[in-house]
Amino acid sequence: MQYDWFQVNFLGCFLNLNLEFKTKLNHKQYSLSEPSVTPRVLHHWHQTGVITDRRAKGKGWSKFSFTELVWIKLIIRLREFGLSLDKIKIGKEDLSKYAAEDAESTFPLLDFYLLYVRSFKHLVNLRVFEDGHLLIGRETELFAQNNYDQKAKDFIHINFNALVK
């Protein structure tokens, strides 16, 4: 039987644990310091479904969780590459895939890899495909998958470690 690192560590452990780390990552305590992202831009992103509005009474875009800030940085980066908001929304859905199973997190996959990067300092990458779908994973798994799949599509490569600094 082949060992599946992701299945054991994410699906088998992280997703089902109530970790204090998840609570900290998802606690709204940080201000957004990206001058290009105004409240108007945030409202537009909310209207297109790229971000979820979790504001109390729908007022004030002043506080975000660490995970939300990482997601906003990723949106900015993907927009710099010319990806449309509709395609970014597809990527959001990929990252939110396991949110129904995790009461603590909107983006369990991001939280998992944030914990992994902080704990082990190994390289984690994002691959964003032309249709907006994305993969996130350790460099070793993504490299192995690319070598296995001879018909691999082109993608945008984003260094997750650099994104979260």
Indicate residue ranges for each PLM-predicted region.
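Basic helix-turn-helix/winged-helix DNA-binding cores
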Residues: M1-W71, I76-L83
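Acidic, low-complexity cytosolic segments
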Residues: S84-I88
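Exposed, interaction-prone assembly regions rather than primary DNA-binding/catalytic cores
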Residues: G91-K165
